[in-house]
Amino acid sequence: MKRDPTKGRKTPDHYARKAKTEHYPARSVYKLQEIQKKHNVLKPGNAVLDLGCFPGSWMMFAAETVGRGGKVTGIDLKKVATHMPAQATSLQEDIYEIDREALAGTLGPLDVVLSDMAPDTMGNKFTDAARSFHLAAAALDLALFLLKPGGHFVCKVFQGEDFQNFVNMVKAEFERHKVFKPETCRKDSKETYVIGFSKKESTHVGS
């Protein structure tokens, strides 16, 4: 019997095919679209930071949403090669090592910080969740430094032992919060998104 060469091979799902048709570099764009449709975190004219921006789907959608009067800056370890609207730029940086004072001087106070960062998974759910928590905590720390009062924060984090701790961290710094898992997440995925709405006045930009 001949071996089926397609057996065990992952085939692109509906959202991956749709992304290709609509000229987005990855299916992850539809997660942000769902978040935007449900929670309206992005507004025309907003200044936005996208952490973990590679390959550029969130940057592209955010730039389209904020329009030419807005600005979107992406940061990732990998270089983004996707062609972007004029109001979007990317930096190849490590979030753990970036000079946030210099970044604040370049970007100014932000309206929204997005983070779709995820660790390179090891196949151990406890290790993967712990590494995701540390990335999310780093994203939150940077967001609190850069966001203006009233600004919003959207962050991916894996469910695990530290998940509720992270939710509580966001809850403490924002007027309200929401835990949201887009329908476009893969069924077996442990990822979810924690959204902080309206950064509290007591958490100062650049503090």
Curated annotation (Swiss-Prot):
Name the record gives this protein: Ribosomal RNA large subunit methyltransferase E
Annotated active site: K156 (proton acceptor)
Source organism (scientific name): Desulfosudis oleivorans (strain DSM 6200 / JCM 39069 / Hxd3)
Stretches for region Disordered: 1-20
Function: Specifically methylates the uridine in position 2552 of 23S rRNA at the 2'-O position of the ribose in the fully assembled 50S ribosomal subunit.
Enzyme class label: transferase
Reaction it catalyzes: uridine(2552) in 23S rRNA + S-adenosyl-L-methionine = 2'-O-methyluridine(2552) in 23S rRNA + S-adenosyl-L-homocysteine + H(+)
Short name of any one Pfam family annotated for the protein: FtsJ
GO cellular component labels: cytoplasm
Residues annotated to bind S-adenosyl-L-methionine: G56, W58, D76, D94, D116
EC number, as in UniProt: 2.1.1.166
Domain of life: Bacteria
Xref: CDD domains: AdoMet_MTases
Disulphide bridges, residue numbers: none
Location, primary (coarse class): cytoplasm
Listed PANTHER family: RIBOSOMAL RNA METHYLTRANSFERASE, RRNA METHYLTRANSFERASE 2, MITOCHONDRIAL
Molecular function GO labels: rRNA (uridine-2'-O-)-methyltransferase activity
Keywords: Cytoplasm, Methyltransferase, rRNA processing, S-adenosyl-L-methionine, Transferase
